[in-house]
């Protein structure tokens, strides 16, 4: 009887320990941790589930998941650009997810058609110009920037970065390879200087008068406009009379080898909620994917815009063609 009593006490202690054990999830992410920390802290407060972040380069993180196989700690892979998410799905990193909440909160064109990954913020890429040189009446479309009237006025970020590859991919989907190549060749003919390594330097070149126009992700402009010296930078929403502004995403999917799929789905659903979407928009100055959430007040002043509703998975499937086209057009 004494042995049974001791055994029951031990089992009770184990049971209590298990009840008090904190559930955990691990995100492998190429996003900056400070963008996510306020959201995952709120998630922990609401659910009691702790979220660990492992940050790094997207390609290296995908390779790590491949190498780790079924032993991977990753429950969620999160990154920027639909092209990279498409690559991850193509490498069989993600599992399919069934969720009415994600279905409701995220527009169909901002997620994988097979529900392997989901957009969590929108990134609009459009025209920015120097108000010292031009007015918004001077602009219309991305394609118009190939016109010789802009010779010596255009600055661009390199095509070696995924953002411009995705923009080119969206144009290939709309116009085909040959017509898009004509446009990109026109851009190159109109360059004022060599291409830049990032959007911020291209914007600074426009502000300083080194060139007059560029194409960038809007959150880079929003960050620069915190400094009054860049007040001469103005935004123009491209292609409002046809397909709309090119949008890309940051997003995430559940890793196939995850042992915590239920909680991982719960976290993705939370990231698509109004609370998280508003926090995310405040932190990164990107646009929410949830219609009822509001962007940062500094970018609300730019007004509403029509966006291209191509399914963003095509930005991945057409990426190889975009790279080839850039090479053929001389876009470094």
Predicted regions and their residues:
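Short beta-strand->loop
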Residues: 28-30, 113, 129-131, 137, ...
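A bilobed periplasmic-binding-protein/Venus flytrap-type ligand-binding module shared by bacterial periplasmic
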Residues: 126-133, 247-260, 279-282
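Ligand-binding pocket segment of bilobal, Venus flytrap-like solute-binding proteins
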Residues: 159, 163, 170-238
């Amino acid at each position: 009887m004494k042995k049974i009593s001791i055994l029951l006490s031990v089992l009770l202690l184990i049971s209590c320990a298990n009840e008090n054990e904190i559930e955990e999830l691990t995100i492998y992410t190429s996003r900056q941790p400070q963008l996510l920390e306020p959201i995952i802290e709120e998630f922990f407060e609401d659910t009691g589930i702790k979220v660990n972040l492992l940050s790094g380069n997207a390609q290296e993180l995908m390779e790590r998941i491949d190498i780790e196989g079924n032993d991977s700690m990753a429950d969620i892979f999160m990154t920027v650009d639909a092209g990279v998410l498409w690559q991850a799905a193509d490498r069989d990193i993600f599992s399919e997810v069934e969720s009415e909440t994600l279905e409701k909160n995220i527009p169909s064109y901002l997620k994988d058609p097979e529900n392997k990954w989901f957009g969590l913020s929108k990134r609009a890429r459009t025209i920015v110009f120097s108000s010292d040189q031009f007015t918004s009446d001077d602009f219309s479309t991305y394609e118009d920037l190939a016109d010789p009237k802009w010779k010596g006025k255009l600055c661009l970020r390199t095509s070696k970065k995924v953002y411009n590859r995705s923009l080119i991919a969206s144009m290939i989907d709309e116009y085909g390879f040959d017509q898009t190549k004509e446009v990109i060749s026109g851009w190159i003919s109109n360059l004022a200087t060599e291409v830049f390594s990032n959007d911020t330097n291209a914007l600074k070149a426009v502000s300083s008068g080194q060139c007059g126009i560029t194409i960038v992700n809007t959150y880079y402009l929003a960050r620069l406009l915190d400094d009054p010296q860049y007040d001469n930078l103005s935004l123009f929403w491209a292609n409002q009379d046809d397909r709309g502004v090119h949008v890309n995403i940051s997003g995430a999917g559940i890793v196939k080898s995850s042992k915590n799929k239920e909680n991982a789905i719960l976290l993705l659903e939370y990231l698509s909620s109004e609370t998280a979407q508003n926090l995310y928009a405040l932190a990164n100055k990107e646009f929410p994917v949830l219609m009822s959430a509001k962007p940062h007040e500094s970018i609300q002043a730019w007004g509403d815009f029509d966006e291209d509703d191509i399914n963003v998975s095509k930005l991945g499937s057409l990426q190889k063609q975009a790279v080839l086209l850039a090479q053929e057009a001389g876009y470094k």
